[in-house]
Structure formats: C-alpha cells, structure tokens
Amino acid sequence: ELESRNMVHDFYESEAFAKLKPIKGTCKQMGHLRDYADKMYIVTGRQSYARDQTEQWLRYWFPNTFDDLIMTNSYTDHEIEKHEICRSLALDSIIDDSFDVCTKCNRMNIDAYNIIGYGDITYPWSVQSSMARTWD
C-alpha cells in the first residue's frame, strides 16, 4: 500500500503528469457546459498533496471553466465521498467514471452521467448502464 501511494505521489510530481493532455474534445465540451451552468466544480478523488499540480493543469487546459476544485482524498482516512460533496453543494448533476458514485448520486436525485471511456477505449472498471456515456 505504501509503495502504491509513493508511486501515485511521484507521478503527480513528474514531467509525465505535467505533459498530460485532456481527452480529445473535453476542453470544448466543458466550455459548452460552462455557457449553461451557474457553477461548475471539479470533484476528484485525488489527495490534497496533488492540489497545486492539479490546479496548474486545470488553469492551463480549462481556463475560467471551473469555480472550484474539491479533493476527496480517496483511499485515505480523510476521504469524503463524492455524493456527500454533491449534496452539500446542492449540485444537480455530476459526470464521473465510477458507476458507484453515479448510483449514489442518482439515489439523491442528482443527475449522473457515467463516463465509461472514449474513442475505442473502455475503462476496465466501467459498468454498462443507462447512465453510461463516452466522450465521443
């Protein structure tokens, strides 16, 4: 477990992370959503130590798109579940790659769009459902 955490931490500090590009089409799609949304948040499972790198990446690729970045600290003792954050912010919808997160949000009357992949790639953890979407 410690080795896994160190690998993830090292990745966020790496040049490889800094050079990551968003999935094709997402910058444009988020811009369109921004035109119609009062507020847009990033709710990510990343741990707090990746905040600076994540904010820098978001500013570069998605300038003036999101109102705030919320880190849930997944897989730590300080984790806050995404559906709880959505409820506390009174969000009406979420886009997420986790079927579990989308299901919990749906149960709270939050519209959920479960992204299961892009192009010819399907995420290995994805579940086919009526919520399932791809970025294409």
List the predicted regions and their residue ranges.
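Substrate-recognition element of Asp-dependent hydrolases with the DxDx(T/V) motif
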Residues: F17-K21, T26-W57, L69-T72
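Substrate-recognition "cap/lid" segment bordering the active-site pocket of phosphatases
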Residues: G45-I95, F99-C102
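Acidic, Mg2+-coordinating phosphoryl-transfer loop and its flanking beta/alpha structural elements
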Residues: L91-W135
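Surface-exposed amphipathic alpha-helices with a cationic face
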Residues: M30-R34, R87, C102, N106
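Conserved phosphoryl-transfer catalytic core
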Residues: E1-S14
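Pocket-edge positions in alpha/beta enzyme catalytic cores
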Residues: E15-A18, D77-H78, S130
